[in-house]
């Protein structure tokens, strides 16, 4: 996927509408944020990307989330060839959550730091805050030492979400890492569509017994 990565970077420099970079930015931001509860339409997401304005009613928080997601995609393109590390994931989180109402109103949601309070995903118990650094480092070490085939990338995503290292933003970071690792390892990258989120969450919940829901 080296050619695709370079094409994304080339098209970003050109700043033209309608190319694959433009299309991926809009579709990835729309779907990943919508899975997490954003009310923006895909057209509104497109308007924000193209003009930094939006027609119709839109929550300020949703606009900020979309804008930050565009920046996160660019940060991912800049680091796509780098190995995973806790520091890289923390930097992604800082980009995603920078300037949000949530981060401004409660230090628990500060950007670029691991969670301070327990959280959950789909009713599943996640890693305790004090255990996050060690478990995440171990997960990354195992992953980086493997073949990093498609199945390994999906397995990493599942185990990252089970750790749920951040107070908020884990799903969006996890899905961006999925995209990054596909680009890095010669796998065609893909977007998890919002209209399939029921199957996506089922896949996360049942992965140990039925990995096929994610694969």
List where the protein language model places each region:
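FIC/Doc superfamily catalytic core
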Residues: 1-215
